[in-house]
Amino acid sequence: MHTTRSSGASTSLTTPGRLLCALAGVLLAWLPQSGLCQQGSSLPNLEPFDKAVLEVMRKHDIPGASLAVAKDGRLLLAKGYGYADKDKQEAMTPQTLTRMGSINKTLTAVMVLKLAEDGKLKLDDPVLPLFEKAGIAPASPADPRAKDIRIRHLLQHSGGFDRERSGDPFFQPRLREIARRQGVSPVSCDAIIRDSLQEKLDFTPGERFAYSNTGYCMLGRVVEIVSGESYRAFSSREFLQPVIGKGFQAASSTESRPGETKYYPFPGEPLQRGAPGVSNANVPSPYGSYSVENMDALGAWIATPTEVLKFFLAIDGTRGKRLLNDESLRAMRSEPVLAKEGNPRAFYGAGIHVVRSDKGDNWWHTGSQPGLQTLALRTRQGYAWVVAFNSRPEHAERRAFFKDIDQALWGAANAVKEWPQGDLFANNP
C-alpha cells in the first residue's frame, strides 16, 4: 500500500468517518485533471480504476462514488471519490454508507435458497397458500392463475407481474393508487401483495421474464413466514453478521442515516410529490417520493461497497463463511425455463443476472433508485467489484450511464498490467 499525491494513487488512510475535502493537502489524494478528491486505500497498479470512476463521475455530473475491488477473494482497493455531501464539503470514503438498491434482491434470493437447502421450503412450492395462512392474501384472488405462482417464479422474475404494463407499486403513481384502494398510509409490502392479487396478472406465471419488485416483496414475506423471524432479524443473524460483522441496516425514506451519503437528484429535476404516509410536501426525489421502509427485501439495505463485496464473495465461499452449497449455487445460476424465451446465454437466474460462456459465468446485480446507482459483479476470471454512485442521470440517459459504468470498470481491469498481491480486508472491516 502506498501514498502518492497528484498521481492517481491512493492514500493509506482508512480512518472511519467523514472527512473534509478541504483537508486534501493532509488527508486526501487529488487528481488535478478532475478536481475531485479521493480517499481510501489500494495496492499498487490499480490506478486505472481511479481513472474509470472519475471519468464516469465527470461525464454524468455525479457528486460522489465509492468502489471496492477484489481478485481471488482478496481486497485490493477500497476508495471513495468526490463528495458524500457537497454543501458540507464532506468526502466520500470507503466507510460511507450508501443505499444499495436492488442489490438487496441478491441477499433475499440467498435467504430463500438457504431455506430450501435446509428443507424449510421447496422452490416449486406455490406462494398463495403461504399468504393465505399469514392473512395477507385476499379472500378471492382476481386471477385464477395466481394459484400457479411458485417461489421459483418470483426468484426469476416470471411470476406474472410486469411493471411496464401495470406500473411499479413501489413508486408513484401506482403507489398512491394502492394507498387509496387499500385505505392505508404509508403503503406496506403486505398491502402491495394484497392489492396485486386483487388485480389480474400481466401474464401467466412462468411464461416470460418481467423484472418485478412485487415478486421480491413477496419473497421477503415468504422468508418471514417460513423462518418465523422478521426479514431484518433473519438476514442479520444467519447471513450478514457472520459475513460482514454487522446486521441489516435499513435506509430512511426522508433522510440519510449517520455515516450515510447524501443523495442527489439529477441536475434540473423538479421536486416530486411526496409518497402517501411519507411526506405531504413536494420533495427532492431521493427523500420522500417513495417509501424505502417497505422495501426491506428488494431495496432498503444500506452498506458500504466493501461490505457488499464480502457478502458476494461469501455466497460460494470464495472468502469467509460459505452461504450456499453447490446445489443451491446451481439453482441460483441456472437458466429459467420460460415458455417464450428458450435458453439464452444471458439471463436472470435466482437473484442474479448471469452471462454464461464455455469458460465460466459472470454474475452480477445492479441497483437504481432516485439519487443512486450501484453495481456488484463477480467474474469468471476471479475479479469482483462493487461500486455505488450518489446520483443518477435523468431517465433517458440511464441506460447509457450504466453502460459507461460497466465498460469503464471492465476497461480498468483489462488495463491492469500486473495484479498486486496482498489483502486489504483487515484494514477495511
Question: Where do the protein language model's features map onto the residues?
Answer:
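Catalytic loop of the DD-peptidase/beta-lactamase superfamily, centered on the K-T-G motif
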Residues: 38-79, 224, 236-237, 272-429
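N-terminal leader/targeting segments and the immediately adjacent pre-domain N-terminus
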Residues: 2-6, 11-92, 98, 114-121, ...
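Conserved beta-strand positions that form and line the central face of beta-propeller blades
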Residues: 80, 91, 99, 126-130, ...
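Short, solvent-exposed turn/loop segments enriched in Gly/Ser/Thr/Pro and often Arg
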Residues: 71, 104, 127, 252-258
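Short active-site loop at a secondary-structure junction
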Residues: 58-66, 88-153, 203-214, 296-299
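Short secondary-structure boundary/capping elements
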Residues: 48, 92, 184-188, 368
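Short, surface-exposed loop or secondary-structure junction motifs
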Residues: 85, 139-362
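Extracytoplasmic/secreted proteins, especially bacterial periplasmic and envelope-associated proteins
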Residues: 44, 48-55, 102, 107-111, ...
